[in-house]
């Protein structure tokens, strides 16, 4: 599977299908037209261009209902649920965050914030969404054993690097890719120490990607 970080919390997963997660793209454009879109929560910096893409979109029930009013073929689900879309398995996991749809007027409640474990072509990727650290991340390790963990590290609106180090240990994925940092001044981070500390004290590898950069991931790749 080819994983591409598109900046902020947006990733493309390309294998037998092309999936885009949280299609807010601060720089550049999508590397390929997605088959499926996944949205972790309703905030504008995650919902992004989901309406414009108008592809099959996996989202929490409230966001899915909103997208359907815009003509998007959305697939609703909720925390703990698992669905399969075009051969790709999506499990919705908890996240500790808020969620608000900004439409006309003051906006409205967007359901719970969430993460996803996405399994395609035998590879499992955990996208944590926007979240604080929580101890039940250990259950994600025990239940799903992800090959890759995509973790927010920017602080302010999510956990920062110190908490993300603990999250990486809880989840136990052999490869961690940081996200949700450096997009805005409030979430500026220098992650060199984060990478050094994790790689010195665990067997986990950290990939610090630049927007638009891709890596190959899978059970045989993550631990290299």
Curated annotation (Swiss-Prot):
HAMAP family: UPF0173. InterPro entries: Metallo-B-lactamas, RibonucZ/Hydroxyglut_hydro, UPF0173, UPF0173_UPF0282_UlaG_hydrolase. It comes from the Archaea. It comes from Methanoculleus marisnigri (strain ATCC 35101 / DSM 1498 / JR1). This is UPF0173 metal-dependent hydrolase Memar_1421. NCBIfam families: PRK00685.1 (NF001911). Belongs to the UPF0173 family. Pfam families: Lactamase_B_3 (PF13483). The lineage of its organism: Archaea, Methanobacteriati, Methanobacteriota, Stenosarchaea group, Methanomicrobia. Gene3D superfamilies: Ribonuclease Z/Hydroxyacylglutathione hydrolase-like (3.60.15.10). Keywords: Hydrolase. GO terms for molecular function: hydrolase activity.
């Amino acid at each position: 599977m080819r994983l591409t970080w598109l900046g902020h919390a947006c990733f493309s997963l390309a294998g037998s299908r092309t999936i885009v997660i949280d299609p807010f793209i601060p720089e550049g454009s999508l590397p390929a037209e997605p088959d499926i879109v996944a949205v972790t929560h309703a905030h504008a910096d995650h919902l992004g261009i989901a309406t414009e893409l108008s592809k099959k979109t996996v989202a929490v029930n409230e966001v899915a209902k909103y997208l359907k009013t815009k003509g998007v073929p959305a697939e609703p689900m909720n925390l703990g649920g698992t669905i399969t879309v075009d051969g790709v398995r999506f499990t919705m996991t908890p996240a500790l965050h808020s969620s608000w749809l900004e439409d006309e007027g003051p906006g409205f409640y967007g359901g719970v914030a969430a993460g996803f474990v996405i399994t395609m072509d035998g590879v499992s990727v955990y996208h944590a969404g926007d979240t604080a650290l929580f101890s039940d991340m250990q259950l994600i390790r025990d239940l799903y054993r992800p090959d890759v963990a995509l973790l927010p590290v920017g602080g302010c609106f999510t956990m920062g690097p110190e908490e993300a180090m603990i999250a990486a240990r809880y989840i136990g994925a052999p490869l961690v890719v940081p996200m949700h940092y450096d997009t805005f001044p409030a979430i500026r981070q220098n992650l060199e120490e984060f990478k050094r500390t994790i790689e010195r004290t665990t067997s986990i590898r950290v990939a610090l990607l630049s927007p638009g950069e891709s890596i190959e991931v899978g059970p045989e790749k993550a631990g290299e």
